[in-house]
């Protein structure tokens, strides 16, 4: 999150804060590749760190749509502008997630392996409202693309080994009348076809981990909570 929000340096090159969701996805894969080439074992990142960049792209696309309609003499109807913007945004989210999936399985680290990566999908990591809805859009696209799979050298659709997926079950997606139930249904279909994602119960994990919910390291251990490591808002630091 810090590297995406505040920029970072990769191979002596300054990487500034991304100005679109697609760029954020590209930067994420570069960070994963660099980390994987300098350590053993797996690594995890959460889609909630990408969620804020959906609205960055939304505002950028909306501005572009307005400019196009002014140039072509079209009426500036907010409903039409919003509809076009959301359609283009969906396309960008689709492209961004596809970039993550294909770059991670085709990248080779310095030891000749694809990065061992786990993607964490937990809606309650972001505030309720538009950001959570944007995160839901990202999660939905990840599930759909994983259900489709990737083509092998013979052109046959197969299940990629990485990234591994973890989906968290909580009050807003666990019952049929909950807002994000459709994601849980999609996750179940994805599991039936591709054997991912794995599932974490937020309720049980909070009981076992002092109220925290977080991913395992790659596909292995869960960190023991270190009380001295805190985020700016006082919550425990896991990323």
Which residue ranges define each predicted feature?
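Conserved catalytic cores of very large enzyme subunits
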Residues: 1-239
């Amino acid at each position: 999150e810090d590297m995406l929000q505040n920029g970072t340096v990769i191979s002596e090159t300054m990487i500034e804060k991304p100005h679109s969701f697609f760029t954020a996805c590209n930067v994420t894969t570069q960070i994963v590749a660099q980390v994987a080439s300098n350590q053993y074992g797996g690594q995890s990142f959460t889609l909630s760190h990408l969620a804020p960049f959906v609205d960055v792209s939304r505002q950028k696309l909306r501005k572009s749509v307005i400019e196009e309609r002014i140039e072509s003499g079209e009426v500036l109807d907010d409903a039409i502008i919003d509809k076009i913007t959301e359609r283009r945004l969906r396309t960008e989210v689709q492209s961004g997630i596809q970039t993550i999936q294909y770059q991670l399985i085709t990248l080779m680290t310095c030891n000749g392996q694809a990065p061992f990566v786990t993607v964490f999908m937990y809606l309650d990591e972001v505030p309720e409202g538009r950001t959570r809805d944007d995160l839901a859009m990202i999660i939905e696209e990840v599930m759909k693309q994983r259900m489709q799979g990737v083509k092998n050298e013979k052109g046959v659709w197969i299940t990629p080994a990485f990234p591994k997926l973890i989906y968290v079950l909580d009050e807003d997606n666990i019952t049929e009348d909950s807002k994000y139930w459709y994601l849980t249904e999609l996750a179940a279909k994805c599991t039936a076809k591709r054997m991912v994602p794995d599932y974490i119960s937020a309720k049980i994990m909070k009981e076992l981990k002092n109220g925290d919910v977080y991913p395992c390291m790659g596909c292995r251990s869960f960190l023991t909570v270190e009380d001295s490591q805190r985020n700016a808002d006082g919550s425990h630091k896991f990323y």
